[in-house]
């Protein structure tokens, strides 16, 4: 889990903590006097579907999309398929990083066709950054500690 990576200003795990932090972050993002930029990272987003954290997370995502702050949401590809409001809100931005995607995943997830590539051309950390229907191939670094 990303929680173990450290370096976060605030961390929540478990539905109650996630719900509370989502509400606090929404208030901070909507407050024009908040200084700096906030990056919100949600790991395993699909774990919060149809639970107490669902609506607060939808509100948070909407607030981030209307601001200059950043959202990073993580889930397995299969989890992005259903059209729950929480997932739809993230996908509607049509911006994302798809690592080792199948050709169809760009269309399914971000409404952007991706080129067919051999699996060997997409080692760990390689994929496509997609924004507003355009894509670029990217390679993320492997950080060793």
Regions found by a protein language model. Name each.
Residues 5-8, 81-145:
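Phosphate-binding and hydrolysis-coupling loops of NTP-dependent motor/remodeling domains
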Residues 1-95:
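P-loop NTPase catalytic phosphate-binding loop
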């Amino acid at each position: 889990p990303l929680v173990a990576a450290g370096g976060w200003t605030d961390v929540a795990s478990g539905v109650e903590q996630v719900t509370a932090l989502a509400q606090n972050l929404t208030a901070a993002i909507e407050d024009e006097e908040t200084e700096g930029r906030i990056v919100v990272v949600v790991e395993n987003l699909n774990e919060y579907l149809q639970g107490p954290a669902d609506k607060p997370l939808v509100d948070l995502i909407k607030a981030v999309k209307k601001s200059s702050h950043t959202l990073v949401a993580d889930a397995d590809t299969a989890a992005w398929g259903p059209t729950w409001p929480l997932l739809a809100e993230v996908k509607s931005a049509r911006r994302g990083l798809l690592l080792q995607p199948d050709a169809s995943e760009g269309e399914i997830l971000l409404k952007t066709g991706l080129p067919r590539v051999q699996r060997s051309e997409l080692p760990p950390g390689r994929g496509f950054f997609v924004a507003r229907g355009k894509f670029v191939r990217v390679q993320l670094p492997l950080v060793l500690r």
